[in-house]
UniProtKB/Swiss-Prot annotation:
Enzyme superclass (EC): ligase
Annotated NCBIfam families: gatC (TIGR00135)
Lineage: superkingdom: Bacteria
SUPFAM superfamilies with a match to the protein in the record: Glu-tRNAGln amidotransferase C subunit (SSF141000)
Protein name from the UniProt record: Aspartyl/glutamyl-tRNA(Asn/Gln) amidotransferase subunit C
Protein family (similarity comment): Belongs to the GatC family.
Species per Swiss-Prot/TrEMBL record: Sulfurihydrogenibium sp. (strain YO3AOP1)
Protein purpose: Allows the formation of correctly charged Asn-tRNA(Asn) or Gln-tRNA(Gln) through the transamidation of misacylated Asp-tRNA(Asn) or Glu-tRNA(Gln) in organisms which lack either or both of asparaginyl-tRNA or glutaminyl-tRNA synthetases. The reaction takes place in the presence of glutamine and ATP through an activated phospho-Asp-tRNA(Asn) or phospho-Glu-tRNA(Gln).
Reaction catalysed by this enzyme: L-glutamyl-tRNA(Gln) + L-glutamine + ATP + H2O = L-glutaminyl-tRNA(Gln) + L-glutamate + ADP + phosphate + H(+); L-aspartyl-tRNA(Asn) + L-glutamine + ATP + H2O = L-asparaginyl-tRNA(Asn) + L-glutamate + ADP + phosphate + 2 H(+)
Length: 99
């Protein structure tokens, strides 16, 4: 990727994320992006033909827990300290959309 494409990509992602980045932040993220892509290239060079895929590994330890309901707070307790609540829901300022 060229620097221009990387810069354009970072600016596009920032815009989609509603972020305003300074020029030096764009440069920093561009360098980090290059480092990540370079690392991925190195990973792609690794010979894994004799390595079992992860899904074939046998893991003896039980990694799932039983789904047992536990006590929780009521809706009223959850919103009692909220600055604003309406109809049992938190009221928060709009963060996306119109500027």
């Amino acid at each position: 990727m060229t620097n221009q494409i990387e810069k354009e990509l970072i600016e596009k992602v920032a815009k989609l994320s509603n972020l305003k980045l300074k020029e030096e932040e764009i440069e920093l993220f561009s360098n980090q992006f290059k480092d990540i892509l370079s690392f991925i290239d190195k990973l792609n060079e690794v010979d894994v033909k004799d390595t079992l895929p992860f899904y074939e590994l046998q893991i003896e330890e039980k990694s799932e827990r039983e789904d047992i309901p536990t006590g929780s707070i009521t809706n009223e307790e959850a919103i009692k300290n909220a600055p604003q609540a309406k109809g049992g829901f938190f009221v928060v300022p709009r963060v996306v959309g119109e500027e």
